Structure formats: structure tokens, C-alpha cells
């Protein structure tokens, strides 16, 4: 992320829950007043989600992480869809993609996350079974290529040597 006078070019976020409009919950699971789990909170993700020119969300594709609606709005995606984001005055363009171990979700015209790509060995049925809403496929859904040995080396040795993400 590069920032100058709140001009954030690109941000990478994660969260405990991501809903069908790319909203992120990193605050509580369950009712706010009596949560099942209290989480760390925004930690700056709210500002990144609201102001970044481009924002990408990275998370494992698990049913518990992909409810139809988040329990709490920590960071704004496309809120309730449509022009809700613009109506609230949130400047950034919203999440460009949600990257998971199964595939890549991208917003459609309404701001709803749809399956834009599947990774090798993964199926739409597998993605749907791990998503809490009726997941749609993008009209031009593609299949990602397996990484080359050199790409894996760079990821494992240079970008993520402690294996936090891979």
C-alpha cells in the first residue's frame, strides 16, 4: 500500500467473514452486544477499504467465512449492492477481487461477488458448498493456470518464506 494524503493506490485485506457484496467483518462473530467471538477489529482495514483505488481480499474459501451477510460491517465492500457505496460517500472503488484457495470472486455490475475464476482441481460445486449465498458464475469465467516452478520458488522463498499465505 502506498499512501499520500489518503490517496491509497492498492490495499490487501483479510477478515473473518466476507459477504456477497465484499463487506468484511473483523470485529465480532454473532451479536455485537453478546458475541460468540470478539475479533481484533479494523486495524486500519476500514480506511483501506474505504479509500483505496484498488482493494483485494485474500482468505481461505470456507463456508464459515462466506455468509450471505456479515455479522458486523468492519470494512465496506459494496454494502447492500447497487449504488449504496456511492450514496454513503465512500470514495474508493471497492474490492476488485476476493482471492481464495478455490478461485477468484469479482464484483458484477450490482457489486455482488461472482465466481470469475477457478483454480486447477477445484469445481464450481466445491466453491458453492463453501459459500453462504447462491454463488453465480461470471459469464466469462476462466480457469487459472497452475503456477510454474519458478513462480512457486519466488512465492515460497522470496515473497512468503515463513509460509504465512502459502
Go through each PLM region and give its residues.
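Conserved phosphate- and dinucleotide-binding cores of soluble alpha/beta proteins
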Residues: 4-136, 147
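A conserved C-terminal secondary-structure "cap"
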Residues: 134, 138-166
Amino acid at each position: 500500500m502506498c499512501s499520500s494524503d489518503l490517496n491509497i493506490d492498492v490495499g490487501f485485506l483479510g477478515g473473518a467473514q466476507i459477504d456477497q457484496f465484499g463487506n468484511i467483518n473483523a470485529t465480532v462473530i454473532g451479536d455485537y452486544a453478546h458475541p460468540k467471538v470478539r475479533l481484533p477489529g479494523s486495524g486500519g482495514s476500514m480506511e483501506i477499504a474505504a479509500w483505496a483505488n484498488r482493494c483485494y481480499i485474500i482468505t481461505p474459501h470456507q463456508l464459515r467465512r462466506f455468509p450471505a451477510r456479515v455479522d458486523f460491517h468492519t470494512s465496506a465492500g459494496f454494502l447492500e449492492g447497487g449504488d449504496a457505496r456511492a450514496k454513503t460517500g465512500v470514495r474508493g472503488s471497492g474490492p476488485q477481487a476476493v482471492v481464495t484457495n478455490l478461485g477468484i470472486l469479482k464484483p458484477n455490475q450490482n457489486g455482488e461477488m461472482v465466481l470469475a475464476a477457478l483454480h486447477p482441481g477445484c469445481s464450481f460445486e466445491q466453491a458453492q458448498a463453501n459459500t453462504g449465498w447462491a454463488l453465480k458464475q461470471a459469464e466469462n469465467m476462466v480457469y487459472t493456470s497452475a503456477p510454474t516452478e519458478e513462480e512457486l520458488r519466488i512465492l515460497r522463498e522470496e515473497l512468503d518464506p515463513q509460509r504465512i499465505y502459502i
